[in-house]
């Protein structure tokens, strides 16, 4: 079942810039979907359509099979189902204390204080930030801020979480913690949609991948399908995952017969190497 869908959406900014050019996109319930593209391709603009922050110039966005209602009450309902975590957590965190920031969404849903308190406690526990309730967000590290921003969305209990460049600006440990958290949330049934230009990350965590370039979707499919079209990947100013690129070089320049498609992860490469050595 398609839990969220964009149908032929176009978007033109007030200055006349056409940012999206007939985008078709969907995610099924329980999927992890990656939107892969270079900077300026339209990833963030597309995401802002998914909970009604932006309204398409033409086309439509559907959540649970229903077109978004852009009235105030309609948007409140959509944002209870679809949560967006911005690339820069400083754009999202504004309250003087962590617990107040996480409580903002549930309070605006009209929940009573006991329910809000329970949701804040549970969300901070899930992201590993229990004990930080009274800390000022601006005193936190980049990874901690990102986790608090995710907690603020979790506290609203959405069905879909959308994250714009979730590992941007994080060191390897911080990035790993965020990705592990997203995997756990997906295991609990949440649909996860991420944007990234990190081609090494996408095959590890995604069920399906979309490639966006110049405001258009130019490829869609499983990681294996998408990365097997090398010309399209490089034509979008992206590259192969490091493992796949290494295998490409070994096969073309050193005559090692790996075959195609190229492995995309260390695990896949290890299995292919073991097969070669048998």
Swiss-Prot record:
In the UniProt record, does the keyword Nucleotide-binding occur? yes
Listed A to Z, the keywords are: ATP-binding, Cell membrane, Membrane, Nucleotide-binding, Translocase, Transport
Among Pfam families, the record links this protein to: ABC_tran (PF00005)
GO terms under biological process: cobalt ion transport
Superkingdom of the source? Archaea
| Family note | Belongs to the ABC transporter superfamily.
Write down what this protein is called. Putative ABC transporter ATP-binding protein MTBMA_c05830
Organism phylogeny: Archaea, Methanobacteriati, Methanobacteriota, Methanomada group, Methanobacteria
